[in-house]
Every structure is written in structure tokens, then in C-alpha cells.
Amino acid sequence: MAATAELIPAGEVIACHTVEDWNNKLKAAKESNKLIVIDFTAVWCPPCRFIAPIFVELAKKHLDVVFFKVDVDELATVAKEFDVQAMPTFVYMKGEEKLDKVVGAAKEEIEAKLLKHSQVAAA
């Protein structure tokens, strides 16, 4: 269990820089049975830079949710796997199931879907 906690620390946005790192951390997150929110981002994307600190605050507030940040240029294969067409894209999942998606830096929508799916995840 300690290994899982180390791979997916609560209260943080977990950045993955290699496919191997991503696969290991996503596997641990899926096994934790927590809601997972993935922010697909890019360094050159102004809306991504706008929403990044808000995403960090959400991670600090929702300790029962696993938050990931994936740079689409670094991990293009992962972005393709999740059918990311625009940045930022937020994907919500639990276990193997993709629950929802938000495209764009829509703070209210991101928070609303986070609350909706974290309540379902807790049930």
C-alpha cells in the first residue's frame, strides 16, 4: 500500500514525463479505486497556463481524487489514446471507465463534474 501512496500522493497534481511513469502511476490510481482527473495540457497553451493553478487548488481541496497533468507534446501517445483534440482537456475516470470530459479552461464545469463524479465514486 505504501508504494501506491508514494506513486499517487494526495493533494498534489501528479506530472508524468515518460510513458512508463504514466503507466505505473495510472495503474496505481486505478487500483486505488479513487476518481481520477487528467489535465491534458501544453506549455505553449495560454488557457492551460490560466487553469493550471486552479487545478492545483482543486487537488489540495479534494484529497480523495487523483489529479494528473499530462503534457501532450511529451506524451503524445497518451494524448492520442484519450482522443485529445484540444488543450486543455480534462478526462474523468474511475478504474478502467472513462466517465466524462471537459474541453477548455471552463473552471465552473471542471469543478461541477469533479463534484458530481467524486460523489458517485464515494457512493
Swiss-Prot record:
UniProt keyword list: Cytoplasm, Disulfide bond, Electron transport, Redox-active center, Transport
Pfam families listed in its UniProt record: Thioredoxin
Disulfide topology: C45-C48
InterPro entries: Thioredoxin-like_sf, Thioredoxin_CS, Thioredoxin_domain, Thioredoxin_H-type-like
Domain Thioredoxin intervals: 2-119
GO cellular component: cytoplasm
Keyword Cytoplasm: yes
Domain of life from the UniProt record: Eukaryota
SUPFAM superfamilies: Thioredoxin-like (SSF52833)
Localization per Swiss-Prot or TrEMBL: Cytoplasm
Purpose: Participates in various redox reactions through the reversible oxidation of the active center dithiol to a disulfide. The H form is known to activate a number of cytosolic enzymes.
Record family assignment: Belongs to the thioredoxin family. Plant H-type subfamily.
Protein name: Thioredoxin H-type
